[in-house]
From Swiss-Prot:
It is found in: Cytoplasm. GO terms for cellular component: actin filament; clathrin-coated pit; clathrin-coated vesicle; cytoplasm; ruffle. It comes from Rattus norvegicus. Residues 53-65 have a biased composition (Low complexity). Keywords: Coiled coil, Cytoplasm, Developmental protein, Differentiation, Neurogenesis, Phosphoprotein. The keyword Phosphoprotein applies. This is Growth arrest-specific protein 7. Residues 1-117 are annotated as: Disordered.
Length: 422
């Protein structure tokens, strides 16, 4: 992806200097943990221990050794200093601190640090708020979807949770519904216009006051004609509303719900794989490693009581099993991190696409509502033009002229009566 996807990376501890006074057995090297405590790693067998190994194979330099065959990672790096994962996908073990951390910590230098640095919520890794620095937003100052919907939210309708991505999908579908309802609203507006035009046309044919005469009669006739003209204007307005506003609103993204459903399934499948498959495998492997380490520790303690070839053989066998359990855990964690990285990248890509779609939807509706107001202004202008002839004729109404015309047509005589003579 072009966008730099900043995920919390881990910094390796500086390796400790090997002892200047004591020569370690072949393959063993010493390092310092992040807390400053020295531990030892066999680079051949990936064996890790807090106690300085002796030159005798299988026996530590001091009683009560607590060794771990887990190829330990400290802050996302192997003890040898090489990254446990590529820097862009490095993550810590996904667990909250538990009461058993003391046992595991004594066997694995970096395990306790891992628990303090991260926290697991619904199978997703997050930096621990008490120990990790604040992350830089992917798109600062933009309030982008890709920055604010990583966690789950309590479902107000029930006792469960709703994924952040699900909230974004709900907004998209709600936007589609709002768009549909706006289209229905315009449809109702069109019906009103059509009914209004029909009534205007019908009224224009009414014969009331049809016998009005003179200039006033002409003005009255124009009033009735203007109703027919206005009816035509409103019919054209309703037709344009249908073709230029209602229809585009209704047909915009006809397959949107189907597309959103596919999108939902894609992200949900990735999240399901992360939780039900990868995280479950990590927890299973972690439990198995704990059991193997306990078994190894128990056999090591037995060695303190009774030294025998059989006990040493049991320790070697337990160490091999512990090593295998450690390898299995690292493999499961690596697969988990890969799955989480895939989910992370798809979340960023998809949320940015949803963001783009929302901007596009809002802009589309805005443009068509602007078209509505433009058509409305045009309708007002046309309506004004229908009454202009009426205004002109009304200005020409002349009661005196009308009287003259009427008298000329209907006069009965201009000889006035006179007094009767005797």
């Amino acid at each position: 992806m072009a966008t730099a996807l900043q995920k919390p990376g881990m910094v390796p501890p500086p390796p400790g200097e090997e002892s200047q006074t004591v020569i370690l057995p072949p393959g063993w090297h010493s390092y310092l943990s992040p807390q400053g405590r020295r531990y030892y790693v066999n680079t051949t067998t990936n064996e890790t221990t807090w106690e300085r190994p002796s030159s005798s194979p299988g026996i530590s330099a001091s009683p009560g050794p607590h060794r771990s065959s887990l190829p330990t990672t400290v802050n996302g790096y192997h003890a040898s200093g090489t990254p446990a994962h590529p820097p862009e996908t490095a993550h810590m073990s996904l667990r909250k601190s538990t009461g058993d951390s003391q046992n595991l910590g004594s066997s694995s230098p970096g395990r306790k640090q891992s628990k303090e640095n991260t926290i697991t919520i619904n199978c997703v890794t997050f930096p621990h708020p008490d120990t990790m620095p604040e992350q830089q937003l992917l798109k600062p100052t933009e309030w982008s979807y890709c920055d604010y919907f990583w966690a789950d939210k309590k479902d107000p309708q029930g006792n469960g949770t709703v994924a952040g991505f699900e909230l974004l999908l709900q907004k998209q579908l709600k936007g589609k519904q709002m768009q549909k309802e706006m289209s229905e609203f315009i449809r109702e507006r069109i019906k009103i216009e059509e009914e209004y035009a029909k009534n205007l046309a019908k009224l224009s044919q009414n014969s009331l006051a049809a016998q009005e005469e003179g200039s006033l009669g002409e003005a009255w006739a124009q009033v009735k004609k203007s109703l027919a003209d206005e009816a035509e204007v409103h019919l054209k307005f309703s037709a344009k509303l249908h073709s230029e506003v209602e229809k585009p609103l209704m047909n915009f993204r006809e397959n949107f719900k189907k597309d959103m459903k596919k999108c939902d399934h894609h992200i949900a499948d990735l999240r399901k794989q992360l939780g039900e498959s990868r995280y479950a495998s990590v927890e299973k492997a972690r439990k198995a490693l704990t059991e193997r380490q306990k078994d190894l520790e128990m056999k090591t303690q037995q060695l303190e009581i009774k030294l025998s070839n059989k006990t040493e053989e049991d320790i070697k066998k337990a160490r091999r099993k512990s090593t295998q359990a450690g390898d299995d855990l690292m493999r499961c964690v690596d697969l988990y991190n890969q799955a989480q990285s895939k989910w992370f990248e798809e979340m960023v890509t998809t949320t940015l696409e949803l963001e783009r779609l929302e901007v596009e939807r809002v802009e589309m509706i805005r443009q068509h509502l602007c078209q509505y107001t433009q058509l409305r202004h045009e309708t007002d202008m046309f309506n004004q033009s229908t009454v202009e002839p009426v205004d002109q004729l009304l200005r020409k109404v002349d009661p005196a002229k009308d009287r003259e015309l009427w008298v000329r047509e209907h006069k009965t005589g201009n000889i006035r009566p006179v007094d009767m003579e005797i």
